Amino acid sequence: MPVRQLPEQIINRIAAGEVVERPASVVKELVENAIDAGASRIDIFTDGGGRRKIAITDDGGGMTAADLALAVERHATSKLDDEDLLQIRTLGFRGEALPSIGSVARLSITTRHKSEPHAWALQVDCGEKSPVVPAALNQGTRVEVADLFHATPARLKFLKTDRTEAEAIREVVRRLAMARPDIAFTIAGEERAPVTWAAALPGAPGQLTRLGDILGADFRSHAIAVQSARESVAVEGFAAAPALTRANALGQYLFVNGRPVRDKLILGAVRAAYADYLPRDRHPVVALFVTLDPREVDANVHPAKTEVRFRNAGLVRALIIHALKEGLAREGRRTAANDGGATIAAFRPAFAPPRPNPGPMNWDWQRSPSAPAAPVPRDHGADAMPAAAAFSPAAFAEPAQAAFDVGGPRADLRLHEQPAAPDLLDRPLGAARTQLHDTYIVAQTRDGLVIVDQHAAHERIVYERLKASLSAHGVQRQILLIPDIVELDEAIVEALLARTDELASFGLAIESFGPGAVAVRETPSLLGKINAAGLLRDLAEHMEEWGEALPLERRLMHVAATMACHGSVRAGRRLKPEEMNALLREMEETPNSGQCNHGRPTYVELKLADVEKLFGRR
């Protein structure tokens, strides 16, 4: 068969296969056109998941009759002033959207430019163009797309259900609305109530308002502002506190020069920044906006314009990591649990008990048969730690359980009679008052109370100490007089012996001790006396999971996290008041103490006003 030039209609349909993948692609292209036209309000309506109808109305600059006739021609655009594709400052620039849509659907455009006495309309029916005719419309443009893929019915069988396609459309609109909080958006149709996002004020407050409207109140209340700039690149936006996570990366919204993108480089940078805060199966929620000179980024990578290529990718990645780490460190003690709203809701009874009849209050609680006995004073004697003693893991390695006298056999709450020093009440985490279930420390602050998970808090402290020691002078180690002989599966032994250098950097010296056994000769002094067998099994399991894919630095941090978990005070360990206060003070001095190495919160803070609401005092 000889080579021949394809007809224009076939060319447009081929191009439509790249540009118009599904109804959401049509909405994306048309909304981007509205944004480029300077619209301050954009209304979107869809029906049948966008297959039956899509209508986009904006109040932008509109088009003249001549521009309208040219707009549906292939590669016709008003967005490039010259031949330089390295100066792209608009969302659209290829001039393919309208002719591609018109080649596979019934396209109708009505538009009015401010210089025109009336509006103009044009229709394209599967590639067949009609003449431009007068019409009625205020300034702006209305684009309607009906019977999508009418000319290529084979494409219809690849579409999902109407509900799924409608949700994909809403996700496209959400991303564009995040990028432009100064524009009002309304999306309606699909037999659902319309959703409107009003135009927000410029700047970070307006940006956070728009993000909160779209991502929800949880994100707004836990959002951390991040910002960093170097040379011609700037990164800003908001990142959720580590306690607010998702099971996938769909909550990560990335924008480059106002363009929503999906970039593996940026996603990898986000993951690296959160590595110290989240387990591998959880993902952060962020909205990051990268701004740089258009000449430093190539947006002409894919027809859908969802991918970009950076000239200096290393700088962009470093800035994102720096911005996120700085913001997370600044809010290091902040967790989702700091807001006592969810906790108060959990405490609140499901029903209101009947109000008792008013009468004389002559009940004596001290003589009630159900009243607990008075607390018995404690005498810690020589076992007590000084109040200012450093809180070290070694002090908690298999200690004798602190003595405690319980007022009643069924009591779960142990009260210490030592009053808190006034200055401790002014500390961020207050003064320790008691311990619940040998697991949670209850501390009093000047305006409320704090409940601390002692294991999670201590785990973060030990982890940060291990990291600091590794980066400074190396982890101090203790030589065991009698080596611990640990019997393990041969596969586990091989995995551990293959990483002896990594383990040695943390003060854990092991060597082979025959088939299926290792000898532990040195352990990190920070961890005190540890269960060597349990630690080695967990390390081997995690090493098998990491493999060689992770960089050495990340593997070392995983080793540190595993060691910290094993070297921390356990739940169920009774603590003395001095020990509890020492732990609180260490938390206040430790970076990122708001969550443990697995992303769980280390403490909950309740304001006195919240507690008073529980009892109807407010």
Curated annotation (Swiss-Prot):
This protein is involved in the repair of mismatches in DNA. It is required for dam-dependent methyl-directed DNA mismatch repair. May act as a 'molecular matchmaker', a protein that promotes the formation of a stable complex between two or more DNA-binding proteins in an ATP-dependent manner without itself being part of a final effector complex. The keyword DNA repair applies. GO terms for molecular function: ATP binding; ATP hydrolysis activity; ATP-dependent DNA damage sensor activity; mismatched DNA binding. CDD domains: HATPase_MutL-MLH-PMS-like (cd16926), MutL_Trans (cd00782). SUPFAM superfamilies: ATPase domain of HSP90 chaperone/DNA topoisomerase II/histidine kinase (SSF55874), DNA mismatch repair protein MutL (SSF118116), Ribosomal protein S5 domain 2-like (SSF54211). Coiled coil: none annotated. One of its GO terms (cellular component) is mismatch repair complex. This is DNA mismatch repair protein MutL. Keywords: DNA damage, DNA repair. The gene is mutL. HAMAP family: DNA_mis_repair (MF_00149). Belongs to the DNA mismatch repair MutL/HexB family. One of its GO terms (biological process) is mismatch repair. InterPro entries: DNA_mismatch_repair_CS (IPR014762), DNA_mismatch_repair_MutL (IPR020667), DNA_mismatch_S5_2-like (IPR013507), HATPase_C_sf (IPR036890), MutL/Mlh/PMS (IPR002099), MutL/Mlh/Pms-like (IPR038973), MutL_C (IPR014790), MutL_C_dimsub (IPR042120). It comes from the Bacteria. PROSITE patterns: DNA_MISMATCH_REPAIR_1.
